[in-house]
Swiss-Prot record:
Mg(2+) binds at T26. The gene is tuf. PROSITE patterns: G_TR_1, G_TR_2. The keyword Amino-acid biosynthesis does not apply. Residues 60-64 are annotated as: G2. It is found in: Cytoplasm. It catalyses: GTP + H2O = GDP + phosphate + H(+). Pfam families: GTP_EFTU, GTP_EFTU_D2, GTP_EFTU_D3. Residues 19-26 are annotated as: G1. Keywords: Cytoplasm, Elongation factor, GTP-binding, Hydrolase, Magnesium, Metal-binding, Nucleotide-binding, Protein biosynthesis. It comes from Microcystis aeruginosa (strain NIES-843 / IAM M-2473). This is Elongation factor Tu. One of its GO terms (cellular component) is cytosol. It is an enzyme of class 3 (hydrolase).
Length: 409
Protein backbone atom coordinates (compact mmCIF):
# COMPACT_ATOMS: atom_id res chain seq x y z
CA UNK A 1 0.00 0.00 0.00
CA UNK A 2 2.68 2.48 1.06
CA UNK A 3 4.49 1.89 -2.25
CA UNK A 4 2.86 4.73 -4.16
CA UNK A 5 4.26 7.64 -2.18
CA UNK A 6 7.94 7.01 -2.97
CA UNK A 7 8.24 9.88 -5.39
CA UNK A 8 11.73 10.26 -6.77
CA UNK A 9 11.97 13.98 -6.26
CA UNK A 10 14.96 13.76 -3.92
CA UNK A 11 18.49 12.85 -4.97
CA UNK A 12 19.08 9.10 -4.87
CA UNK A 13 22.01 7.46 -3.07
CA UNK A 14 22.93 3.77 -2.83
CA UNK A 15 24.37 2.69 0.50
CA UNK A 16 24.99 -0.52 2.39
CA UNK A 17 25.96 -1.86 5.79
CA UNK A 18 29.39 -3.50 5.97
CA UNK A 19 31.37 -5.08 8.81
CA UNK A 20 32.06 -8.26 10.77
CA UNK A 21 29.41 -10.96 11.05
CA UNK A 22 27.43 -10.65 14.36
CA UNK A 23 28.33 -7.01 14.91
CA UNK A 24 24.73 -6.02 14.16
CA UNK A 25 24.50 -4.93 10.51
CA UNK A 26 21.09 -6.47 9.91
CA UNK A 27 19.71 -5.25 13.26
CA UNK A 28 20.89 -1.74 12.37
CA UNK A 29 19.25 -1.93 8.93
CA UNK A 30 15.96 -2.92 10.62
CA UNK A 31 16.33 -0.14 13.21
CA UNK A 32 16.85 2.48 10.47
CA UNK A 33 13.66 1.42 8.64
CA UNK A 34 11.62 1.39 11.88
CA UNK A 35 12.91 4.81 12.95
CA UNK A 36 12.26 6.46 9.57
CA UNK A 37 8.90 4.68 9.23
CA UNK A 38 7.69 6.74 12.21
CA UNK A 39 8.16 9.82 10.00
CA UNK A 40 6.36 8.10 7.12
CA UNK A 41 9.64 7.87 5.18
CA UNK A 42 10.09 4.11 5.05
CA UNK A 43 8.35 0.80 5.27
CA UNK A 44 9.32 -0.78 8.59
CA UNK A 45 11.15 -4.07 8.06
CA UNK A 46 11.63 -6.66 10.79
CA UNK A 47 15.00 -8.30 11.37
CA UNK A 48 13.74 -11.61 9.96
CA UNK A 49 12.52 -9.98 6.74
CA UNK A 50 15.98 -8.57 6.08
CA UNK A 51 17.87 -11.62 7.31
CA UNK A 52 15.96 -13.95 4.99
CA UNK A 53 17.61 -12.21 2.06
CA UNK A 54 16.61 -13.61 -1.33
CA UNK A 55 19.22 -15.20 -3.56
CA UNK A 56 20.25 -13.18 -6.59
CA UNK A 57 22.44 -14.00 -9.50
CA UNK A 58 25.02 -11.43 -10.55
CA UNK A 59 27.43 -12.33 -13.34
CA UNK A 60 26.76 -16.01 -12.75
CA UNK A 61 27.40 -15.85 -9.01
CA UNK A 62 24.67 -16.48 -6.44
CA UNK A 63 24.54 -13.84 -3.73
CA UNK A 64 22.13 -13.33 -0.85
CA UNK A 65 21.29 -9.65 -0.54
CA UNK A 66 18.45 -7.77 1.10
CA UNK A 67 17.37 -4.45 -0.39
CA UNK A 68 15.39 -1.88 1.58
CA UNK A 69 14.53 1.67 0.66
CA UNK A 70 13.88 4.70 2.83
CA UNK A 71 14.03 8.49 2.83
CA UNK A 72 15.48 11.16 5.03
CA UNK A 73 14.40 14.79 4.78
CA UNK A 74 16.91 15.40 1.99
CA UNK A 75 17.45 12.11 0.15
CA UNK A 76 16.08 8.82 -1.08
CA UNK A 77 18.21 5.78 -0.21
CA UNK A 78 18.48 2.24 -1.51
CA UNK A 79 20.18 0.20 1.20
CA UNK A 80 21.75 -3.22 0.71
CA UNK A 81 22.52 -5.68 3.50
CA UNK A 82 24.16 -9.09 3.01
CA UNK A 83 23.74 -11.56 5.84
CA UNK A 84 26.84 -13.70 5.20
CA UNK A 85 30.49 -12.70 4.93
CA UNK A 86 30.98 -14.55 1.64
CA UNK A 87 27.94 -12.70 0.21
CA UNK A 88 29.59 -9.39 1.10
CA UNK A 89 32.82 -10.26 -0.64
CA UNK A 90 30.96 -11.37 -3.77
CA UNK A 91 28.63 -8.37 -3.73
CA UNK A 92 31.47 -5.87 -3.40
CA UNK A 93 33.46 -7.44 -6.24
CA UNK A 94 30.63 -8.08 -8.71
CA UNK A 95 29.07 -4.70 -7.95
CA UNK A 96 25.70 -6.48 -7.87
CA UNK A 97 24.50 -3.69 -5.63
CA UNK A 98 26.60 -0.60 -6.29
CA UNK A 99 27.41 1.44 -3.19
CA UNK A 100 27.99 5.20 -3.19
CA UNK A 101 28.84 4.97 0.49
CA UNK A 102 28.78 2.51 3.34
CA UNK A 103 27.88 2.32 7.01
CA UNK A 104 30.66 0.36 8.70
CA UNK A 105 29.23 -1.41 11.74
CA UNK A 106 31.69 -2.26 14.53
CA UNK A 107 30.70 -3.78 17.86
CA UNK A 108 31.88 -1.45 20.64
CA UNK A 109 32.14 -4.52 22.88
CA UNK A 110 34.54 -6.38 20.55
CA UNK A 111 36.30 -3.73 18.49
CA UNK A 112 37.49 -4.29 14.90
CA UNK A 113 37.76 -7.94 13.83
CA UNK A 114 39.49 -9.61 10.82
CA UNK A 115 36.36 -9.25 8.65
CA UNK A 116 36.17 -5.56 9.60
CA UNK A 117 39.60 -5.12 8.05
CA UNK A 118 38.71 -7.16 5.01
CA UNK A 119 35.56 -5.11 4.36
CA UNK A 120 37.43 -1.81 4.71
CA UNK A 121 40.12 -3.09 2.31
CA UNK A 122 37.46 -4.24 -0.15
CA UNK A 123 35.64 -0.91 0.09
CA UNK A 124 38.92 0.80 -0.79
CA UNK A 125 39.74 -1.63 -3.64
CA UNK A 126 36.35 -1.64 -5.32
CA UNK A 127 35.77 2.08 -4.94
CA UNK A 128 33.17 2.62 -2.22
CA UNK A 129 34.20 6.25 -1.84
CA UNK A 130 32.94 7.14 1.64
CA UNK A 131 32.19 5.41 4.92
CA UNK A 132 30.39 6.44 8.11
CA UNK A 133 30.87 4.33 11.25
CA UNK A 134 28.26 3.04 13.69
CA UNK A 135 29.76 1.73 16.94
CA UNK A 136 27.08 -0.75 17.91
CA UNK A 137 26.28 -2.52 21.20
CA UNK A 138 27.14 0.58 23.26
CA UNK A 139 24.63 -0.72 25.84
CA UNK A 140 27.09 -3.55 26.59
CA UNK A 141 30.02 -1.21 27.33
CA UNK A 142 30.02 0.40 30.79
CA UNK A 143 33.42 1.98 30.47
CA UNK A 144 33.57 5.26 28.50
CA UNK A 145 37.34 4.81 28.07
CA UNK A 146 36.87 1.46 26.35
CA UNK A 147 34.48 3.12 23.89
CA UNK A 148 37.08 5.80 23.15
CA UNK A 149 39.75 3.13 22.62
CA UNK A 150 37.60 1.26 20.12
CA UNK A 151 36.88 4.53 18.28
CA UNK A 152 40.62 5.30 18.07
CA UNK A 153 41.31 1.79 16.82
CA UNK A 154 38.65 2.13 14.09
CA UNK A 155 39.98 5.54 13.02
CA UNK A 156 43.52 4.16 12.79
CA UNK A 157 42.33 1.19 10.75
CA UNK A 158 40.45 3.47 8.31
CA UNK A 159 43.51 5.71 7.94
CA UNK A 160 45.68 2.65 7.17
CA UNK A 161 43.42 1.89 4.21
CA UNK A 162 43.49 5.49 2.88
CA UNK A 163 40.12 6.62 4.20
CA UNK A 164 39.90 9.96 6.04
CA UNK A 165 40.12 8.25 9.45
CA UNK A 166 40.27 11.51 11.39
CA UNK A 167 37.23 13.07 9.71
CA UNK A 168 34.84 10.14 9.30
CA UNK A 169 31.79 10.53 11.54
CA UNK A 170 31.58 7.81 14.22
CA UNK A 171 28.25 7.44 16.00
CA UNK A 172 27.88 5.15 19.01
CA UNK A 173 24.57 3.51 19.83
CA UNK A 174 22.67 0.26 20.10
CA UNK A 175 20.71 -0.99 17.11
CA UNK A 176 19.05 -3.65 19.28
CA UNK A 177 17.85 -1.16 21.94
CA UNK A 178 16.60 1.25 19.25
CA UNK A 179 14.79 -1.56 17.45
CA UNK A 180 13.16 -2.80 20.67
CA UNK A 181 12.01 0.71 21.60
CA UNK A 182 10.61 1.38 18.12
CA UNK A 183 8.84 -2.00 18.09
CA UNK A 184 7.01 -1.05 21.31
CA UNK A 185 6.53 2.62 20.30
CA UNK A 186 6.24 2.65 16.50
CA UNK A 187 5.36 6.37 16.47
CA UNK A 188 8.38 7.41 18.55
CA UNK A 189 10.10 10.59 17.37
CA UNK A 190 13.49 12.22 17.86
CA UNK A 191 14.08 13.10 21.51
CA UNK A 192 11.96 10.27 22.95
CA UNK A 193 14.76 7.78 23.51
CA UNK A 194 18.58 8.00 23.51
CA UNK A 195 19.00 4.85 21.40
CA UNK A 196 16.56 6.04 18.75
CA UNK A 197 18.32 9.41 18.75
CA UNK A 198 21.59 7.65 17.87
CA UNK A 199 19.89 6.27 14.74
CA UNK A 200 18.78 9.81 13.79
CA UNK A 201 22.32 11.03 14.42
CA UNK A 202 23.69 8.27 12.18
CA UNK A 203 21.31 9.16 9.34
CA UNK A 204 22.19 12.86 9.68
CA UNK A 205 25.87 11.88 9.33
CA UNK A 206 25.08 9.77 6.24
CA UNK A 207 23.12 12.68 4.76
CA UNK A 208 25.88 15.20 5.31
CA UNK A 209 29.07 13.14 4.93
CA UNK A 210 28.32 10.84 1.99
CA UNK A 211 28.20 13.03 -1.14
CA UNK A 212 25.46 12.69 -3.73
CA UNK A 213 27.02 10.76 -6.62
CA UNK A 214 27.32 12.31 -10.04
CA UNK A 215 24.47 10.95 -12.14
CA UNK A 216 25.37 8.82 -15.16
CA UNK A 217 23.71 11.35 -17.44
CA UNK A 218 26.10 14.11 -16.28
CA UNK A 219 29.25 12.11 -17.09
CA UNK A 220 31.02 12.21 -20.48
CA UNK A 221 29.30 10.17 -23.20
CA UNK A 222 30.22 6.49 -23.61
CA UNK A 223 28.55 3.59 -25.37
CA UNK A 224 29.96 0.07 -25.69
CA UNK A 225 29.41 -1.36 -29.17
CA UNK A 226 27.31 -4.53 -29.18
CA UNK A 227 26.54 -4.86 -32.88
CA UNK A 228 27.35 -3.20 -36.21
CA UNK A 229 25.19 -2.84 -39.36
CA UNK A 230 25.60 -1.12 -42.71
CA UNK A 231 22.60 0.75 -44.02
CA UNK A 232 22.83 1.28 -47.78
CA UNK A 233 23.12 4.94 -48.60
CA UNK A 234 23.38 5.98 -44.97
CA UNK A 235 26.55 4.40 -43.64
CA UNK A 236 27.48 2.32 -40.63
CA UNK A 237 25.37 2.01 -37.48
CA UNK A 238 26.73 0.82 -34.15
CA UNK A 239 24.19 -0.34 -31.58
CA UNK A 240 24.48 -0.68 -27.82
CA UNK A 241 23.33 0.68 -24.51
CA UNK A 242 24.52 4.17 -23.68
CA UNK A 243 26.44 3.73 -20.43
CA UNK A 244 26.75 7.38 -19.53
CA UNK A 245 26.30 10.93 -20.72
CA UNK A 246 24.33 12.35 -23.64
CA UNK A 247 25.10 12.16 -27.36
CA UNK A 248 23.66 14.53 -29.96
CA UNK A 249 23.65 14.48 -33.75
CA UNK A 250 26.74 16.36 -34.94
CA UNK A 251 28.88 15.45 -31.90
CA UNK A 252 32.49 14.48 -32.45
CA UNK A 253 33.30 11.11 -30.89
CA UNK A 254 36.13 8.57 -30.80
CA UNK A 255 36.16 4.83 -31.45
CA UNK A 256 38.34 3.35 -28.71
CA UNK A 257 39.74 -0.13 -28.18
CA UNK A 258 41.11 -3.15 -30.10
CA UNK A 259 42.63 -0.93 -32.84
CA UNK A 260 44.03 2.57 -33.17
CA UNK A 261 41.70 5.17 -31.66
CA UNK A 262 39.99 7.10 -34.46
CA UNK A 263 37.76 10.17 -34.55
CA UNK A 264 34.38 10.35 -36.27
CA UNK A 265 31.14 12.31 -36.15
CA UNK A 266 27.64 11.20 -35.16
CA UNK A 267 25.35 11.72 -38.17
CA UNK A 268 22.24 10.10 -36.74
CA UNK A 269 20.76 8.47 -33.62
CA UNK A 270 17.99 5.91 -33.77
CA UNK A 271 15.85 4.22 -31.16
CA UNK A 272 12.98 1.83 -31.83
CA UNK A 273 13.32 2.62 -35.56
CA UNK A 274 12.76 6.34 -34.95
CA UNK A 275 15.32 9.09 -35.48
CA UNK A 276 16.23 11.16 -32.45
CA UNK A 277 18.22 14.35 -31.86
CA UNK A 278 19.94 12.83 -28.84
CA UNK A 279 20.43 9.65 -26.86
CA UNK A 280 21.13 9.51 -23.12
CA UNK A 281 22.44 7.18 -20.41
CA UNK A 282 20.30 4.05 -20.21
CA UNK A 283 19.03 4.20 -23.81
CA UNK A 284 19.52 1.30 -26.20
CA UNK A 285 20.38 3.17 -29.37
CA UNK A 286 21.84 2.90 -32.84
CA UNK A 287 24.44 5.51 -33.72
CA UNK A 288 25.27 6.40 -37.34
CA UNK A 289 28.91 7.32 -37.85
CA UNK A 290 30.42 9.41 -40.65
CA UNK A 291 33.10 7.85 -42.86
CA UNK A 292 33.27 4.58 -40.96
CA UNK A 293 33.10 1.25 -42.80
CA UNK A 294 31.51 -1.80 -41.25
CA UNK A 295 34.98 -3.37 -41.13
CA UNK A 296 36.38 -0.44 -39.09
CA UNK A 297 34.30 -1.13 -36.03
CA UNK A 298 33.50 -4.22 -33.97
CA UNK A 299 31.86 -5.42 -30.80
CA UNK A 300 33.99 -4.58 -27.78
CA UNK A 301 34.99 -1.11 -28.92
CA UNK A 302 33.44 1.91 -27.25
CA UNK A 303 32.22 5.14 -28.77
CA UNK A 304 33.06 7.99 -26.42
CA UNK A 305 33.49 11.72 -26.05
CA UNK A 306 37.02 12.51 -27.37
CA UNK A 307 39.80 12.26 -24.80
CA UNK A 308 37.68 10.77 -22.01
CA UNK A 309 38.81 7.13 -22.14
CA UNK A 310 41.96 5.42 -23.36
CA UNK A 311 42.72 1.85 -24.39
CA UNK A 312 44.88 -0.17 -21.98
CA UNK A 313 46.43 -3.63 -21.91
CA UNK A 314 47.61 -4.10 -18.33
CA UNK A 315 45.78 -3.74 -15.03
CA UNK A 316 45.48 -4.98 -11.46
CA UNK A 317 42.21 -6.56 -10.45
CA UNK A 318 40.60 -7.69 -7.21
CA UNK A 319 38.99 -11.03 -8.08
CA UNK A 320 36.65 -13.55 -6.52
CA UNK A 321 37.24 -17.02 -8.00
CA UNK A 322 34.10 -19.16 -8.16
CA UNK A 323 34.06 -22.35 -6.14
CA UNK A 324 33.37 -25.71 -7.73
CA UNK A 325 29.84 -25.62 -6.22
CA UNK A 326 29.17 -22.28 -7.91
CA UNK A 327 30.04 -23.74 -11.30
CA UNK A 328 33.66 -22.60 -11.24
CA UNK A 329 36.80 -24.60 -11.88
CA UNK A 330 37.48 -27.82 -10.02
CA UNK A 331 41.24 -27.33 -10.02
CA UNK A 332 43.62 -24.51 -9.04
CA UNK A 333 45.43 -22.25 -11.51
CA UNK A 334 48.89 -20.70 -11.54
CA UNK A 335 50.98 -17.89 -13.02
CA UNK A 336 50.65 -17.41 -16.80
CA UNK A 337 47.11 -18.81 -16.80
CA UNK A 338 45.36 -17.49 -19.98
CA UNK A 339 41.59 -17.18 -19.66
CA UNK A 340 39.25 -14.64 -21.31
CA UNK A 341 38.39 -11.38 -19.61
CA UNK A 342 34.84 -10.29 -20.37
CA UNK A 343 34.63 -6.50 -20.24
CA UNK A 344 31.42 -4.61 -21.09
CA UNK A 345 30.45 -6.46 -24.30
CA UNK A 346 33.39 -8.63 -25.25
CA UNK A 347 35.87 -11.34 -24.29
CA UNK A 348 39.59 -10.53 -24.56
CA UNK A 349 42.27 -13.12 -23.89
CA UNK A 350 44.74 -12.15 -21.19
CA UNK A 351 47.67 -13.64 -19.32
CA UNK A 352 47.68 -13.48 -15.52
CA UNK A 353 51.21 -12.40 -14.62
CA UNK A 354 51.07 -12.66 -10.82
CA UNK A 355 48.88 -13.04 -7.74
CA UNK A 356 49.08 -11.06 -4.50
CA UNK A 357 47.50 -11.66 -1.08
CA UNK A 358 46.01 -8.88 1.11
CA UNK A 359 49.29 -8.53 3.02
CA UNK A 360 51.24 -7.95 -0.20
CA UNK A 361 52.88 -11.37 -0.32
CA UNK A 362 53.11 -13.28 -3.61
CA UNK A 363 50.79 -16.24 -4.11
CA UNK A 364 51.79 -19.09 -6.43
CA UNK A 365 48.53 -21.04 -6.67
CA UNK A 366 44.90 -19.87 -6.72
CA UNK A 367 42.13 -22.19 -5.57
CA UNK A 368 38.43 -22.11 -6.53
CA UNK A 369 36.65 -20.02 -3.85
CA UNK A 370 39.65 -17.70 -3.23
CA UNK A 371 39.69 -13.91 -3.30
CA UNK A 372 42.91 -12.63 -4.83
CA UNK A 373 44.59 -9.61 -6.41
CA UNK A 374 46.03 -10.30 -9.87
CA UNK A 375 48.02 -8.49 -12.57
CA UNK A 376 46.66 -9.09 -16.07
CA UNK A 377 48.12 -8.39 -19.53
CA UNK A 378 45.53 -8.37 -22.36
CA UNK A 379 46.42 -9.35 -25.94
CA UNK A 380 44.41 -6.40 -27.35
CA UNK A 381 44.10 -2.91 -25.90
CA UNK A 382 40.56 -2.13 -24.77
CA UNK A 383 38.83 0.85 -23.18
CA UNK A 384 38.99 0.14 -19.46
CA UNK A 385 39.09 2.30 -16.35
CA UNK A 386 39.53 1.94 -12.62
CA UNK A 387 36.44 0.62 -10.83
CA UNK A 388 35.16 -1.29 -13.87
CA UNK A 389 33.79 -4.79 -13.41
CA UNK A 390 34.84 -7.79 -15.47
CA UNK A 391 34.25 -11.53 -15.56
CA UNK A 392 36.90 -14.19 -16.10
CA UNK A 393 35.71 -16.90 -18.46
CA UNK A 394 36.99 -20.16 -19.78
CA UNK A 395 35.24 -21.82 -22.69
CA UNK A 396 32.24 -19.53 -22.28
CA UNK A 397 31.61 -20.22 -18.59
CA UNK A 398 32.33 -17.74 -15.82
CA UNK A 399 35.06 -18.88 -13.44
CA UNK A 400 35.67 -15.59 -11.64
CA UNK A 401 34.48 -12.04 -11.18
CA UNK A 402 36.60 -8.98 -10.64
CA UNK A 403 36.96 -5.25 -10.45
CA UNK A 404 39.84 -3.19 -11.87
CA UNK A 405 41.67 -1.69 -8.90
CA UNK A 406 44.51 -0.05 -10.86
CA UNK A 407 45.45 0.63 -14.50
CA UNK A 408 49.11 -0.15 -15.17
CA UNK A 409 49.49 0.68 -18.88
Amino acid sequence: MARAKFERTKPHVNIGTIGHVDHGKTTLTAAITMTLAALGNAQAKKYDEIDAAPEEKARGITINTAHVEYETASRHYAHVDCPGHADYVKNMITGAAQMDGGILVVSAADGPMPQTREHILLARQVGVPNLVVFLNKKDMVDDEELLELVELEVRELLTNYDFAGDDIPIIAGSAKEALEYMTKNPKAQKGDNEWVDAIYELMEAVDSYIPTPERDIDKPFLMAVEDVFSITGRGTVATGRIERGIVKVGDNVELVGIRETRPTTVTGIEMFKKSLDQGMAGDNAGILLRGIQKTDIERGMVIAKPGTIKPHTQFEGEVYVLSKEEGGRHTPFFKNYRPQFYVRTTDVTGTIQDYTADDGSTVEMVMPGDRIKMTVELINPIAIEQGMRFAIREGGRTIGSGVISKIIK
